Amino acid sequence: FRPALAAAPRRISPGLRVNPDYAEVAVALYNPCAPGSRLGIRRAQFEGESLAGIEGLHFHCLCEQDADVLERVLARVEEQFAPFFGGLRWINFGGGHHITRPGYDVDRLVRIVAGFRARYPHLQVVLEPGEAVALHTGWLVASVLDIVEADLPVAILDTSAEAHMPDVLAMPYRPEVEGAGKPGEKAWTCRLAGLTCLAGDTIGTYSFDAPLQVGDRVVFADM
């Protein structure tokens, strides 16, 4: 990429993504440091002499996590890559920080960043809050198209897990539904499903105070 950088019409500060082979992400699909991950250069393949012109390092090892996990990840990053910090200008701590989530330990994050800056005062620290910027800011409003009887009543909605909320199928992830509870928690339990031909286009099982009817609105929070 060096020829492309040299030919760029504006100045670019190039960096490399590194992989410290350490993360605490429970779902393998979202774990950038899982065995066999293609994301980031591992220490064993890291050649210091190849850093000419490189101004920063980037690591992304978190997924919806708190500052305590960042602290442990950062310790691994320093252990492996600190010898290369001297010639750099910046380091990017990546995303996955749930900074705006209630209960997030902001004071601990401040201490972590301040401590790192004290150890490496020449490095600018970059954070990518990612999802935290938009946490709890959007809703998806669906309507009930039909009720199908199976082992449980199935409410067919005019939305789709596959098309509109793929994390439901990938993680799996259970979206929050306004006014709904866990299965059996409220008077009527049903399965919410999409309208596609995918057999597994199922959003989850929820309970409601009263049976859903065709035309009722179902509001998914934190979309």
What does each model-found stretch correspond to?
Residues 23-24, 63-66, 98-101, 133-136, ...:
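Flexible loop/turn segments at secondary-structure boundaries
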Residues 21, 35, 62, 98, ...:
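Residue-level marker of positions within ordered structural domains that often coincide
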Residues 28-31, 56-59, 95, 126, ...:
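Generic, low-specificity signal for short hydrophobic/alpha-helical stretches with a mild N-terminal bias
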Residues 1-92, 103-105, 112-115, 119, ...:
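Active-site-proximal beta-alpha core segment in soluble small-molecule metabolic enzymes
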Residues 17-21, 96, 160, 195:
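Generic beta-structure capping elements
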